[in-house]
């Protein structure tokens, strides 16, 4: 479960970007204590130049054996790729490994959400590292790739996150607090009213109402001309 505190992109990988031959992304704080990518980012797109506004749809706390496949069906039908931040112990439950394999094969981005959904900021460095590495191992076993992108539970980063150049911590800019309600309509309303180009939407695929809301959000925003991308494309393109 999330605290509801909205925080945006946490970009702590300047050296990694230099290594990849890309200019570092500039970041700034806005009045809501969220971090937003500056004018070099997708938020600076001139939509009037016939460039589609883009947003990223992200899901935490999965996979869930019953609700996640329904979500994947809806996204596939609409040709939408999303980003899933997975809890390691959930991946290992039941038949969930098959769901993760499907996510990967259908082009979704898979990220790390720790092994037990712990507050990384309250753990010793070694314990926090273990939480992340356990989930890395579980995901890599299925996809063949170690996740680079991380969403810290509750938005609370580990104490040494600035030194961890192998990970990119991703936050959010639109949080409808879907885990607090079963009213899918209310979730949809919040997202549609708050959305702007370049936003990162936070939802949870473990709740049926959130899955219903996600599909309706996709339909409404696609109708408004939005394109959905994974977070790597949002911050690196």
Where are these regions (language model features)?
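Active-site beta->alpha N-cap acidic-glycine motif
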Residues: 32-121, 127-128, 138, 146, ...
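Membrane-interface motif at the C-terminal end of an N-terminal transmembrane signal
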Residues: 21-34
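N-terminal Sec-pathway targeting helices
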Residues: 1-16
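C-terminal domain-boundary segment and adjacent tail
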Residues: 24-27, 41-42, 46-49, 77-79, ...
């Amino acid at each position: 479960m999330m605290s509801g505190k909205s925080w945006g992109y946490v970009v702590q990988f300047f050296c990694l970007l230099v290594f990849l031959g890309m200019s570092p992304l500039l970041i700034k704080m806005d009045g809501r204590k969220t971090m937003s990518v500056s004018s070099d980012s997708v938020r600076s797109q001139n939509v009037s130049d016939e460039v589609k506004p883009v947003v990223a749809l992200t899901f935490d706390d999965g996979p869930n054996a019953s609700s996640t496949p329904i979500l994947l069906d809806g996204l596939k039908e609409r040709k939408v790729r999303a980003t899933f931040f997975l809890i390691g112990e959930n991946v290992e439950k039941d038949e969930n490994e098959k769901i993760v394999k499907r996510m990967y094969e259908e082009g979704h981005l898979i990220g790390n959400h720790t092994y037990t959904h712990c507050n990384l900021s309250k753990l010793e460095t070694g314990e926090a590292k273990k939480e992340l590495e356990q989930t890395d191992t579980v995901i890599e076993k299925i996809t063949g790739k170690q996740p680079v992108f991380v969403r810290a539970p509750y938005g609370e980063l580990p104490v040494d996150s600035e030194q961890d150049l192998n990970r990119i911590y991703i936050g959010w800019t639109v949080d409808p607090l879907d885990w607090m309600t079963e009213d899918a309509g209310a979730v949809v309303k919040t997202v549609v009213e708050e959305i702007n180009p370049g936003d990162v939407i936070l939802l949870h695929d473990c709740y049926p109402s959130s899955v219903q809301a996600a599909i309706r959000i996709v339909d409404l925003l696609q109708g408004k001309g939005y394109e959905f991308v994974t977070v790597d494309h949002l911050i690196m393109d």
